[in-house]
Every structure is written in structure tokens, then in C-alpha cells.
Amino acid sequence: MSLAWSAGRAWSRQSYAAPPAAAKTPPSELEARIAAIPIERYRNFCIVAHIDHGKSTLSDRLLEYTGTISASDANKQILDKLDVERERGITVKAQTCTMIHNHEGEDYLLHLVDTPGHVDFRAEVTRSYASCGGALLLVDATQGIQAQTVSNFHLAFAQDLALVPVVNKIDMPAADIPRVLEQMQNSFELDPKDAIMLSAKTGKGVPNVLPAVIERIPHPVGDEKKPLKMLLVDSWYDNFRGVVLLVRLFDGTIKTGDNVISLGTGMKYTVGQVGIQYPHATPTKVLRAGQVGYVYFNPGMKKIQDAKLGDTFTFVGAEDNVEPCPGFEEPKPMVFVAAFPTDQSDYSRLADSINQLVLNDRSVTLQKDFSEALGSGWRLGFLGSLHCSVFQDRLRQEHGKSVILTEPTVPSKIIWPDGSEEVVQNPALFPDVSHPRIRGAQLFEPFVTATITMPEEYLGRVIELCEANRGEQKSLEFFHTTQVILQYEIPAAQLVDDLFGKLKSATKGYATLDYEDSGWRQSHLVKLQLLVNRQPVDAICRVVHSSQVDRLGRQWVTKFKEHVDRQHFEVVIQATAGNRIVARETIKPFRKDVLAKLHAADVSRRRKLLEKQKEGRKRLRASFMSR
């Protein structure tokens, strides 16, 4: 991931009085102001919401209001630093920024985290909470509470964060503020009187946000005199500095030249530079307890794998006196795809490009793969379908590489008769029914708990869709007279099969979806394969539930037939599950009349020409299958 701390797109509106920011604060003056602020006047907070509710826009307004950035055409979505984030209008990577705000004559040091809204990037949100004491719970006045609003609330509540409810987009004609306030009270037990009404687009109501943050969110707790206790919250790779760490200090101070040790790996480092994001990387002489900033080492940390998120750092020699911070749960890939270069001669260059992206996205798993049809490639694991799509876009934009991606699949688990377990990520490696040990084995597939919100009028259609996708209803709740929250347990395989797109179609775009892993369930799984003239095509293979075999098999052969040209010999396309052929399509050959010029009585010549044509078709068929 390229985190070169570059600015975002433009914003030309300024409908409120923000402090002048034309002249950038000199580094020495900035450090002096920060040094004069005690930890009691620190506030660390994040903005959480459903996707497209206005988190990044509100972040821009707060940065402008505090004078951290100027209200110019160059500063829209300034915390969205990836091209794909600006193009899609979504936040993929949680970004941080430090602000200084004068409230009632006193300076406050505010640390803001802009978090992703999409469920695929929930791990980014969870890590952000570790560096915060509170959160702005943002809700779109036109949409109301949606699936990821509910999920983010429960995550924040579990972390015991102080919540400040904020209603955004109040300037929109479709805004229904009383409905949103009622939803907040009924679903989250948040007092409507505490909600802040604003429009992040125009700036209306934005000046009320920071006083509420200062008054309602507690300051961090820490002691500068204690030994260093530093939590690793995030990391990224820089070509010149090596691995750069985003850290939160609980105790002590850290400065350039300090010798630190990782309690997780035992490796020792010398600090090369410390600083804050203001909003870009701004070096400082020291980071103190309660602050969030960046650190890199000299010589630099070379491997991103050495930066274990949730790790604790302290001074060399103080290891026995510091209790490690609770670590983070590493996100597990839920979607796997095989990736191949469009031209095998580009394999080495594409490998370098993929490795560079994986350096900065630790949630992507990578291992080499090979296909008889497509050649050498990789098997990539992603957190979800959007994560996969974003990775492909970044590969194209940042490295100019195109790649062939197979259909997304989910892993399956096998418990063999002897009790040993095996997780199969590549469907081609899933054992067939002819495998000697498969009869006594137990097969499992991953399930997710899906939370769906929608208007009441679409409830019947959504239930029908979930049941058709092998879902089991867990709860049904009306959190408003016209809004429903529906909870289903659904196989992860059905989720990646464009369930969200089907939900949008069934509800005319009004449904929202959030999900979380709910573990493995025993299931009747079979391997569905595509054969062309009895030869398996390994790139087209999937592990599916037995109830889906016939439908998918017919879809495969029908679709594959459309992409195969007619030949001089018969092409037979079959979908098989175990020993059973579930669907078949035949492409008839071109026919050349080799007997047209023969006399009717020339039987031997007739037989000879027919045999020659038959042999020729065999050679063509063999040549076709070897391509």
C-alpha cells in the first residue's frame, strides 16, 4: 500500500468561520504548543459509521476547523490517500491525524482516526478502537441506522468507548431527523438530546463537534515517568525508511536514538525518527504517554511480518517491568481466488507488483499456485469480495498490471477418520469421492452471521432470498415502524456468490448487509468440476453443497459453451460431481464432405477417405486439449 502521506481531492465550500490556516505552524512552535499540553487535555477519538454516511467528509471539516489544513481545492478526502479510495468514494485504510484545538482559552491535543465503513475492513476499525477513548457514532439523516452502524456500535460498546451520537446530512431534502433520533434511542439507548446535528458537506453544526468531544470523551491515562509501554496499532512499508509503525503510548516517552525491544518477537531496534501525522508525517523530538504517532527505526525494520499488530515495545532492559498490552486478533481470510498473469512472460514483474502490495496489506495471504490451463500464478486470500476487488484495482492503478482472477471460493475443512484436521483453500485439491479415506471423513464449511436492515415492505422478498441461499433465521426486529433488522446464519459460500448484489436488487437498493464469522458447520460437500472432452479444467473447479450441484452444473456448461468456438471435431462439455455427470453440452463439428467427388461404386476409396478424416479429427482433438 502506498502511504506516501499525499493530499486528497478538492473541496471548495466554506460556509462556516474556520481559523485561518494559510500559514503553516513552524515545527518548533508546534512542538512547543504540544509540550505545554498536559495529558488531561488529550483526546483520542475516531469516527465510525456505515459506508457512505460521511466519515471522511466530516474528518475534512474538523481538520479545516482546527486549522490543520486549509479549506482549499487540494484538501478534499485528505485522509483517503489511495487512488482507489478517492475513485470509489470509500475508506479502505484507517488513517490518523493530530489536531490542536483551543477551547475556552486552553489548547487541547486531539487525535482523530478516520475508519473504513465497509464490513470487509472491520479489522481496521477494531484496531483503531485500541488507540481511542471514544467515538463519534455518525448516522446519515436520509438513511437512518443501517447494518454496519449496528455492528460498529456493538464493537465500540464492547471496548467501553464513550459514544457521541452525530446526525449528518441534515441539509438534504430527504433528511428525517426525528426518525433517526428515535432509532438511536430504541436501538442504542442513546439520549436524543446528546445528538449533534450537522452537515459535513456545508459545515453547518461542525463547530459543535469538538466541544462535545472534549466534554464527553475521557482523556487517556498514562505516566511519562514510567518505563516505555508502546502499543503497535498499524504499520506500512516505505521504500526508504523500511517498516513505519503507528503507535499509541500508554506510559513513558520515546525519542530518536532510544533503544527499544519488542516483547512479542524479542528483536531490538534503535529509533530513527518519531513524529505525528499533522496531517502528513511531521517529525517531533519526542512522543509522550497518551499520544498517537509514528516511529521508524535506523537501520529500518525490513520485513512487515516483524511488525506484529498488537505487539508491545519498551526500552531494552525494562522488559521485566512492563506488562504486555492485550494483542489483536489477526483477521482471517474468508475469500480465496487464484490469480494468473495474462501473459506468462510477465510472471516475474507481476510477482514483484503483488509482493509490493502484500507488504502493506497484511490481511492478504499469498502462496504460489499452478494451473494446467492458465500456467503459474498465486492463490490469494482476502477478507471479502470488496477487499478482493480493491486489491485488483490497486494492482492495476499503482503497478499497471492486469491479472486473471478465478471465481471467489471459501475454504472447507475435513476431519479425517483418524481425527486429524485439514483446511482446504484450493478447490482443485479437495478430495474426490474416489478418495479411499473420504467415506469416513466429516466435511465442514464456514458460516457467517449476517445482519440485514431494510424497509418493511421488502421483508418477504429478503426472507425468500435468504432461505433460497440456505440461510437460517435467528432474529427479526422492528427498530422503527418502517425499518426491520433481520439476522440470518448463512454459508460463507453463498455470501461470496454476490448475495449483497441480490439483496440490493430485491430491495431496489435499500438493503444493507453486515456479517461476522460464526465458525464451521458440518455439511454435505462435493467437488464440482468442468470437463472438456473428458479432461478436467482445473481453473474451473468449486466445492459446493450437494443441493447446489445441479443448478451450478447447468449454469457452467451453458456459459462455457458460449465461449468455445466450433471445431472440426465434436467438443463435449460436462459438469461432474464425483462419479455423476450433472450437465452436458455438445458443440457439433464442422462437416466437410470428403466423398463429394467419388463415384458411388468406389467403395475402397470411400473407406480410405473416411478413415483419413477420422484420424485427422483425432489429431485436432489432441492438439485442442493440449493447448
UniProtKB/Swiss-Prot annotation:
SUPFAM superfamilies with a match to the protein in the record: EF-G C-terminal domain-like (SSF54980), P-loop containing nucleoside triphosphate hydrolases (SSF52540)
Main localization of the protein described in the UniProt heading: mitochondrion
CDD domains in the cross-refs: EF4_II (cd03699), LepA (cd01890), lepA_C (cd03709)
Compartments, record wording: Mitochondrion inner membrane
The keyword Disulfide bond appears for this protein: no
Ranges annotated as spanning the membrane: none
One Pfam short name: EFG_C
InterPro entries in alphabetical order: EF-4, EFG_III/V, EFG_V-like, EFTu-like_2, G_TR_CS, LepA_C_sf, LepA_CTD, LepA_IV
Transit peptide range per the UniProt entry: 1-16
Membrane topology (UniProt): Peripheral membrane protein
Chain ranges of the tr-type G domain: 40-221
UniProt record similarity statement: Belongs to the TRAFAC class translation factor GTPase superfamily. Classic translation factor GTPase family. LepA subfamily.
Role played: Promotes mitochondrial protein synthesis. May act as a fidelity factor of the translation reaction, by catalyzing a one-codon backward translocation of tRNAs on improperly translocated ribosomes. Binds to mitochondrial ribosomes in a GTP-dependent manner.
Protein name: Translation factor GUF1, mitochondrial
Native organism: Fusarium vanettenii (strain ATCC MYA-4622 / CBS 123669 / FGSC 9596 / NRRL 45880 / 77-13-4)
Gene it is expressed from: GUF1
